[in-house]
């Protein structure tokens, strides 16, 4: 029996699909010989079948499939225990409100959240999804699409989705459409937020009925996060007023939904940037003021170059659970560009 393998290649590597050991190397021919003793008196055809069966048992064993690279970790911050996604869904199913705190540009994290939402819908058919990514004035458009009254093209035209909608948020909307779940368009419309920031008067019905901007820990974290983005203190204060108005709008939207469905007691998942819920601040704090008896859980997304070697001590202070995902690769520079 003659077989060809590359220099330094093991027998099982040789049998793998094309592409394992490519390169500019010369192949060596390896001759494997063996002798089979067959019982005498067998017919020629019987001898052939027996020989083939022996050869099949003398082939080299195949190597076990390589373990898949772990794409995310889920950590319960109270105990430090790592959880599987189904186990996390089991733990969360008894809550009233869950915050999916996200890094908006992390594709891996969005995929995990979409899978988790589906698992929660399996356990809680009364699931409701609230989203920062849609503004309050397009609630009717969102609901019309979920109920099949308009097609997707019309929905996309009038709902003003974020630019990464197709990749990152469409799975959630389609899950809601397939399972007949409600979606809350939670965010404050941008023009209204702009008027809040500039202290212009507004009678917009989409403003939260109550909104405050206290100079508390949330303000401290906000100013720290915005360093290098805004120069003047007054500019920082304007942005903070708009930030707080958005938090109050999203909290109010969820509280109002719960108020008009008092007998359902649904599980609400709120999808939002992690800053709106980390440390129980932002939207999380304002919803707790409006619905103080609700049992909430916060998940915060953490992106690291190597998720297997991470000191999460400080991150564990942010939330009840951490979703640890790889840092997205930096986009390649266009040819000929430098700096």
State each model region's role:
Residues 128-134, 298-301:
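Short internal beta-strands
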Residues 123-128, 139-262:
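A substrate-binding/cap region within the structured catalytic cores of diverse enzymes
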Residues 57-95:
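N- or domain-start disorder-to-order transition segments that initiate the globular core
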Residues 80-81, 85-121:
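Zymogen propeptides
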Residues 43-51:
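Sec-dependent signal peptide recognition
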Residues 106-112, 128, 136-141:
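Membrane-embedded segments
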Residues 249, 258, 262, 266, ...:
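C-terminal regions of proteins
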